[in-house]
Amino acid sequence: MAKQDYYEILGVSKTAEEREIKKAYKRLAMKYHPDRNQGDKEAEAKFKEIKEAYEVLTDSQKRAAYDQYGHAAFEQGGMGGGGFGGGADFSDIFGDVFGDIFGGGRGRQRAARGADLRYNMELTLEEAVRGVTKEIRIPTLEECDVCHGSGAKPGTQPQTCPTCHGSGQVQMRQGFFAVQQTCPHCQGRGTLIKDPCNKCHGHGRVERSKTLSVKIPAGVDTGDRIRLAGEGEVGEHGAPAGDLYVQVQVKQHPIFEREGNNLYCEVPINFAMAALGGEIEVPTLDGRVKLKVPGETQTGKLFRMRGKGVKSVRGGAQGDLLCRVVVETPVGLNEKQKQLLQELQESFGGPTGEHNSPRSKSFFDGVKKFFDDLTR
């Protein structure tokens, strides 16, 4: 019968860290321990499985072998019999094949590329629309200026790894074959630091802050990301640096709202202007422009001003500015103004004057019909 996957036995993912594995083992071991389940053969068998899985997954060499070859790594005298070395060496015949399949290969493992960094940049709407150049200061890892990235104390050199003899790989028995595995002693680098640099302690990198000038193109919006190649953390022992990603966040504007490449704003007008029409000034990002408001304009009407929006960062036509009219009810009226409005209302035929207020007529006709239907 096929053996159960070790990760499934412990209930952890294949990327689980050692502390997660230990925590899962402790919980399951307490549950299935023979002392707590005396005479229960199933619990005893389960406890053995848990212990076996724990022993493999907390041993870095055994876990690496299991991840690549599964249970076969420990069968037919695999790692359990002799570990590294010994046995028939078919690496010249099968080395490239196993290297391609399992990601190992026979060459030395490359030093790790530096990590990518992220910087959150807040922009005003004006900066986002027009583009801007900003200086930023970021904490990062840079090459040690004492050992120049080698990790070794000045005057010394990294030593060849005695386990893999500088290849970064060791042979591991897999059934009838000997296949290549990353050296667990030097982690595939092929060298060891005997006398580490006093400044970087053998890492080849030190923490520093650096200042960069970042050019933000016109038209960016919240969520856009700008990549600065090679401006991330420097890699280990001379490996390439990672990248820096600048994440854009545009601040809320007191007047405009942005949707895609269009801008929206609310323009208040008094009811006399709405009824009679006229000309008003409206704001744009380039200054004030005149807008002609026709008579009988209702609240919510949109006026489109073409080309007054945002030019797309990806090219194409410039967006528009859409002005939404809001008709304001006057406040703080004096007696004369109230009298004039009263006369105006009476000239309409009362509060629900039908001739001059078609929407009011439609509304009250609907209300009347509703109550008429209820009384039938």
UniProtKB/Swiss-Prot annotation:
SMART domains: DnaJ. It holds the Pfam family DnaJ_CXXCXGXG. Residues 5-70 form the J domain. Zn(2+) 2 binds at residues 161, 164, 183, 186. Zn(2+) 1 binds at residues 144, 147, 197, 200. The keyword Lyase does not apply. It is found in: Cytoplasm. One of its GO terms (molecular function) is heat shock protein binding. PANTHER family: CHAPERONE PROTEIN DNAJ (PTHR43096:SF48), DNAJ HOMOLOG 1, MITOCHONDRIAL-RELATED (PTHR43096). Homodimer. This is Chaperone protein DnaJ. The lineage of its organism: Bacteria, Pseudomonadati, Pseudomonadota, Gammaproteobacteria, Enterobacterales.
